[in-house]
């Protein structure tokens, strides 16, 4: 998936999801301040997306609906979304990935039906995802650095390297 970087970090009972604001069409920057990270389910869930914007909004709506059916059960809601995404003829064509997190779990959801929980609490998607992921993993064990500092530094590194990622970030956090 091209066009963005979304990073999620879980540390010391807190979780943060951060994403850049660049929207690209081919090789052209269309918008630099898009909000690809938002809160769902009465602000108890944070979700970020990479991929086609219209597809992501469709998935946000579907996830919100699943969360309404299964309140407080993020894993179940995500598995139900992934099932629909994989089986529905229309949804199968959507080109996006999502990171979702609540106070207890972080998940990556893909269009191939995967619902993955990162074993170390760090996940990233999008064109700059591997850069942000590597930087966050390198910074996570440094004493005295906050989860916000790790996330912002990792995103800065990703934006410095990835042409589809910019420095305008949106940060959402859930305290443990």
Curated annotation (Swiss-Prot):
Allosterically activated by HslU binding. A double ring-shaped homohexamer of HslV is capped on each side by a ring-shaped HslU homohexamer. The assembly of the HslU/HslV complex is dependent on binding of ATP. It comes from the Bacteria. Pfam families: Proteasome. Belongs to the peptidase T1B family. HslV subfamily. The keyword Protease applies. GO terms for molecular function: metal ion binding; threonine-type endopeptidase activity. Protease subunit of a proteasome-like degradation complex believed to be a general protein degrading machinery. This is ATP-dependent protease subunit HslV. The active site is at 4. Keywords: Allosteric enzyme, Cytoplasm, Hydrolase, Metal-binding, Protease, Sodium, Threonine protease. Disulfide bonds: none annotated. It catalyses: ATP-dependent cleavage of peptide bonds with broad specificity. Gene3D superfamilies: Glutamine Phosphoribosylpyrophosphate, subunit 1, domain 1. The gene is hslV. Its EC number is 3.4.25.2. It is found in: Cytoplasm. The keyword Zinc does not apply. Na(+) binds at residues 159, 162, 165. One of its GO terms (cellular component) is HslUV protease complex. GO terms for biological process: proteolysis involved in protein catabolic process. Transmembrane segments: none annotated.
